[in-house]
Amino acid sequence: MSNPVESASFFEKVPLPAVNAARFPDYHPALTAQAAVVEANRCLFCFDAPCAQACPTHIDVPRFIKKIASENLAGSARTILEANILGASCSRACPVDVLCEGACVLHRYNKQPIEIGRLQRFAMDAFHASGAPLPFDPGVPTGKSVALIGAGPASLACAAELRRAGIRAVLYDARPLPGGLNTYGIAEYKLPLAESLREIDML
């Protein structure tokens, strides 16, 4: 069995090569601050929110978008992270066209659905750029520990929840870097390696 993945700055160890960035530009480019506010204000903030119901992690979509509209980016990111600790990578890799955006009520009126994925990415990118720590305190140490086999998204999310419960998590993986599919299996133009590792570094 390989050594446990220790807490380290993987983002600094493996920078994104410039040639990769040139060859594989973003499939869905990041929104500017102005474009994000304009897009957020298109949202109807539905009470029953079919977009949130279609989200596998049940992010409160209207709430995080409303906070973008009011330029409360920290609050928006917190709303996302409360439901999905891997909200940054999901904002880039999630098939939103068949999930949240596919459920947007604007389809009923032959309108372009709200770009939920890009708005989520905007909020999470702003959160990462701020250098703020995760908005959750670790739980009181219980003295317990759990071994997680594989350091993919499921194990990372589990480790974060365990830490909030005061339980130490040790991740084991056959590969040198954590992240599983996020790090090794998603095309660079959707989820760059450096972005996956930056999110893991934050965790």
Question: What residues fall within each predicted segment?
Answer:
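Glycine-rich FAD pyrophosphate-binding loop
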Residues: I167-T183
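Feature captures the FAD/FMN-dependent oxidoreductase FAD-binding
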Residues: V140, S145-I149, L197-M202
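Ferredoxin-type iron-sulfur electron-transfer modules and their immediate structural context
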Residues: M1-S145
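N-terminal glycine-rich dinucleotide-binding loop that anchors FAD/FMN and/or NAD(P) in oxidoreductases
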Residues: I114, G185-L203
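Residue-level detector of alpha-helix initiation sites
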Residues: I85, G152-P153, L177
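N-terminal Rossmann-like FAD-binding beta1-loop-alpha1 element of flavoenzymes
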Residues: S145-V170
